[in-house]
């Protein structure tokens, strides 16, 4: 995963909203999908894009998959922005 992939994943408003939701803690794909008027496949696509970009991680518990923010990648992105101030 690269910063380029992470920034590209952030370009979509739905994915931005998903990340904002995850700031409150981990959520299941079903709980995330309940906030949007789109198919489960579309929500899965957005979650997969965020996962491939390293912005979220998935945790399997039994038959459920939960998603949470990957703070290490977010911190890396913030560090990149802070370097621009120098």
Model-identified regions with their sequence ranges:
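Short helix-coil-helix linker/hinge
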Residues: 9-14, 71-72
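Short capping segments at the starts of secondary-structure elements
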Residues: 13, 25-28
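Pre-recognition alpha-helix immediately N-terminal to the DNA-recognition helix
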Residues: 16-18
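Base-recognition residues in the alpha-helical recognition helix of bacterial helix-turn-helix
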Residues: 20, 44-48, 63
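A short acidic, leucine-rich amphipathic alpha-helix
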Residues: 32-33
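Beta-hairpin "wing" of winged helix-turn-helix
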Residues: 51-61, 68
